[in-house]
Amino acid sequence: MAELITVARPYAEAVYSLATEQGKLDQWSDALSWLAAMVNNPDLAQVVTNPKHTAQEVEALMLDVLGSRGNDDVKRFIAALIENARLTLLPEIAAQFELLKAQSENIVDALVESAFALSDEQKAELTNTLSKKYGKAVRLDVRENADLIGGVRVSVGDDVIDASVRGKLQAMAASLKN
């Protein structure tokens, strides 16, 4: 995983720089999202990674699927990825691009895992608390995880706040072993 990030980051930074220069962050975000989805689609992935297809055929197919999202810069980007055998990195490139975009917009993404569904009020309270803690706007991704037994686990970047019953039980078990 770390290797993918290391290889994908320069591509994401280059695209981010170009998108910022052109004032087209949202358009690039949309295009990268579509390109990543193509590579993640098993049927399309088989076609674009099949050595029987020429680089021009793969590029044409991807641009055809992209439709109006594909401009000359996107075309050159796809060509560069094909030339360097990096098409499979598109999902990670898109993720790194979104991180850069969120940083520039002063937004932090938070993954919230909860044993039970959270109410809108609880989500708003979490958003407020995290926003104060990080000094940024917070974009929540809330998921249910019954394995937590109760409580929540919040991940923001490398920070993990584990206020779950499972986390507390694991901490107690670890302290009893020592």
From Swiss-Prot:
Q: Which UniProt keywords apply?
A: ATP synthesis, Cell inner membrane, Cell membrane, CF(1), Hydrogen ion transport, Ion transport, Membrane, Transport
In the bilayer, the protein is annotated as: Peripheral membrane protein
Compartments where located: Cell inner membrane
Show the GO MF annotations: proton-transporting ATP synthase activity, rotational mechanism
Signal sequence region:
none
List GO terms (cellular component aspect): plasma membrane; proton-transporting ATP synthase complex
Enumerate the HAMAP family for this protein.
ATP_synth_delta_bact
- Tell me the function of this protein: F(1)F(0) ATP synthase produces ATP from ADP in the presence of a proton or sodium gradient. F-type ATPases consist of two structural domains, F(1) containing the extramembraneous catalytic core and F(0) containing the membrane proton channel, linked together by a central stalk and a peripheral stalk. During catalysis, ATP synthesis in the catalytic domain of F(1) is coupled via a rotary mechanism of the central stalk subunits to proton translocation.
| Membership in a protein family | Belongs to the ATPase delta chain family.
**Database matches in NCBIfam families:** ATP_synt_delta, PRK05758.2-2
Subunit structure of this chain's protein: F-type ATPases have 2 components, F(1) - the catalytic core - and F(0) - the membrane proton channel. F(1) has five subunits: alpha(3), beta(3), gamma(1), delta(1), epsilon(1). F(0) has three main subunits: a(1), b(2) and c(10-14). The alpha and beta chains form an alternating ring which encloses part of the gamma chain. F(1) is attached to F(0) by a central stalk formed by the gamma and epsilon chains, while a peripheral stalk is formed by the delta and b chains.
Name the record gives this protein? ATP synthase subunit delta
Protein species of origin: Chromobacterium violaceum (strain ATCC 12472 / DSM 30191 / JCM 1249 / CCUG 213 / NBRC 12614 / NCIMB 9131 / NCTC 9757 / MK)
